[in-house]
């Protein structure tokens, strides 16, 4: 079995992931592939559905080289196993076994494989459909699900993964874009920086208003709980990935599930909270962080696209990014966020 090494420092970190390389890596970690292979939608990592002898399939995730440390990934895996132990519906990574001289497996659950310069996790395949968020009973069920997730999340903490706050998501994004030579077109550069700086200042004020007396409680979160990351079956909701797990306020896992403006969201939030508070207490004061968190996500998303632009998958998927029209739209959206946050 050949094991070409991932170009860790290259803008093309997945260039070596040919179909044979993917199948070889899976077999190097103790599974027997039958040749079936399908690439799944993922930008940050590379994810494949791999068929196994016997007819089953697994999901193999190749983490972006240089993005995570072993410690950060293993905290993600431990959280998944903690949730699984508490019977919270989540797909935890499988235990692996090194079956090649160049392969090794690490972690308390032997769940992180190293093959040919790649970090790899393999999970069972679980299906489902998008949740029907216009159904109040679905929202109540999701509320109970998130309450259980956060109850488990509160029983430990991440020491190596990100803590969500205005510095880690907002200031870091502005700093990166400001220091990039070609991310911001000259004609809109200062307008965007002004809009982003003012929006971030308003987000900081909102976070500051939560403390020190009302310090925001930090728990382990899913971190990216939008409808596309949830799957629904007759048994209820589950999710299959904790790639963005972080420390932060519980409200971070709620607001992305609720589309529309504040008035449209209110009845949906009521149903979600009805389910949540049937199992756990929720700090309603932290709802004031929804618009600041939305602002931080906007800043972070722009910086994320800029950081990944050398990866050919990104220009193909986001051809509008980096244009003057894109940045002018961001200026308008950030200015709107500033007004909304000022109004409280």
PLM region spans:
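A glycine-centered beta->alpha junction motif in the catalytic cores
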Residues: 65, 99, 117-133, 174-184, ...
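ATP/Mg2+ or Mg2+-diphosphate-binding catalytic cores
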Residues: 2-3, 10, 183, 303-344
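ATP-binding pocket architecture of kinase catalytic cores
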Residues: 52-159
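A cross-family kinase active-site recognition segment
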Residues: 132-191, 216-218, 317-318
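Active-site activation/catalytic loop segments of kinase-like enzymes and analogous catalytic loops
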Residues: 250-281, 297-313
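Activation segment
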Residues: 65, 128, 237, 245-247, ...
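Conserved NTP-binding catalytic cores of kinases and kinase-like/nucleotidyltransferase enzymes
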Residues: 1-98, 234, 342-344
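Active-site acidic catalytic loop and adjacent metal/ATP-binding pocket
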Residues: 41-60, 93-95, 204-254
């Amino acid at each position: 079995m050949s094991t070409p090494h991932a170009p860790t420092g290259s803008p093309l970190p997945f260039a070596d992931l040919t179909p044979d390389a993917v199948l070889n890596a899976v077999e190097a970690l103790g599974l027997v592939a039958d040749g079936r292979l399908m690439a799944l939608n993922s930008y940050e990592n590379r994810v494949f559905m791999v068929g196994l002898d016997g007819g089953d399939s697994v999901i193999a995730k190749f983490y972006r080289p240089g993005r995570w440390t072993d410690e950060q990934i293993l905290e993600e895996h431990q959280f998944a196993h903690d949730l699984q132990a508490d019977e919270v519906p989540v797909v935890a990574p499988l235990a692996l076994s090194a079956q090649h001289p160049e392969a090794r497996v690490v972690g308390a659950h032997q769940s992180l494989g190293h093959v040919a310069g790649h970090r790899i996790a393999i999970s069972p395949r679980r299906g489902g459909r998008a949740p029907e968020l216009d159904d109040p009973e679905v929202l109540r069920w999701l509320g109970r699900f998130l309450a259980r997730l956060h109850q488990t999340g509160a029983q430990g903490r991440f020491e190596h993964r990100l803590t969500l706050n205005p510095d880690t998501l907002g200031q870091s994004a502005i700093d990166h874009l400001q220091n990039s030579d070609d991310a911001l077109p000259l004609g809109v550069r200062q307008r965007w920086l002004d809009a982003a700086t003012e929006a971030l200042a308003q987000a900081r004020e909102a976070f500051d208003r939560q403390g020190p007396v009302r310090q925001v409680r930090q728990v382990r979160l899913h971190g990216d709980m939008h409808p596309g990351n949830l799957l629904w079956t007759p048994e209820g909701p589950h999710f299959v990935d904790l790639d963005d797990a972080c420390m932060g306020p519980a409200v971070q896992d709620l607001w992305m599930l609720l589309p529309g403006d504040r008035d449209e969201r209110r009845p949906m939030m009521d149903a979600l909270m009805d389910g949540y508070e049937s199992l756990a207490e929720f700090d309603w004061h932290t709802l004031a962080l929804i618009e600041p968190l939305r602002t931080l996500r906007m800043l972070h998303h722009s910086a994320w696209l800029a950081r990944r632009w050398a990866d050919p998958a990104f220009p193909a998927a986001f051809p509008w990014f980096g244009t003057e029209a894109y940045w002018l739209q961001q200026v308008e959206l950030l200015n709107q966020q500033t007004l909304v946050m000022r109004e409280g």
